[in-house]
Amino acid sequence: MLKSNSVYAAGGGAGSTPSRTAHVEAKKKTQAGWKKQNGKWYFYSSDGRKLTGWQTIRGKRYYLGKDGAKRTGWKKIDEKMYYFGKNGVMRTGWKRINGRKYYFGKNGVRSTGWRKIDGKKYYFGNKGVMRSGWRLIEGKWYYFGKGGALRTSQWIGNYYVNSKGEWVSQPSDVVRLNVKNILQRPELPMGCEVTSLTIALNYHGYNVAKGYLSDNYLPKGSSSSTSPDEGFLGNPRSWSSWYCYSAPIVTCANSYLESVGSDQRATDLTGTKFDNLLYLLDDGKPVVIWGTLSMGSPRTNGRWYVGGRSYPRYINLHCMVLTGYDKKKDLVYVADPLVGNVSYRLSTTRVRYAQMGSQAVVIR
């Protein structure tokens, strides 16, 4: 006999009615997504389950604890540190937190130690804080700029850091770089500056010819309207021309380097003490300098007056490339575009360099 309080679904057997099933499904749907319960946020799947662990929700990464609660702030997961914003989203890239800078990889892991980012090197302490200024790391001193990038191959005040970023207290006693010389003549009878630049560029792996640089990138002008600080006076291909100083050579070099998509640049070191150039050689970088022919005493023949300024007209000014030195022997090694690879007295070269305005250019 059928009891009056029993309910049978269509098709036979006791169970939920269609209306009850619809009610349950509707309840599940209302639970899907983020829900705040007792002050904490949880995420429910479409079937009503509370999710836990790593979850990607609408393209954002979250971490939900074992209890399903959304995590915010710092969180150590599998021995790695992550940071989640107030909204629970995992942070990546550069982030400033409580006044300190951190870097999180694409996977969200906080960086520590050395890290290369967008072509620059940075250092992060054990707690992930980006370092700046002078830092002693594994027994060596390094300098990091205000933005945190490691400084290399340059002077920081009175201290030199090499291409690895390491502070060099004193350059080696003897250095000799393997620099191939190029002669300026016959094509460029007056082109010692642009030929010296070509020597330096070739050393750094740029297959460029002296004539190409001279014709296409070297600023030029006449001695009546152009100073040697602005451009080459005349044309290096002409015997009746003069010379230029460091600035036009830097312009020439950087115009070329930009045209070939290089990240390297020429730096005008004019004013740098001669002995400080030895650090660059010790760092593997030849240096273009201005001196005199055979390091003889400077000789002039009148002056130029351009733009309200007076310039001595040197008749034995010469540009060459420093390729090494030997302190004990008082020698510098030079790639001279007029005579080839030669050596001069270091002490004499120091004086001539100063007399010619302490002009120097380096590629780095």
Name these PLM-found stretches.
Residues S45, N126, G291, D336, ...:
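Pocket-edge structural micro-motifs
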Residues S169-T251, L293-M295, T300-Y305, S310-Y314:
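Active-site-adjacent structural segments surrounding the nucleophilic cysteine of cysteine proteases
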Residues R303-G307, R313-Y314, M320-R364:
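Noncatalytic regulatory segments and standalone regulatory/sensor domains
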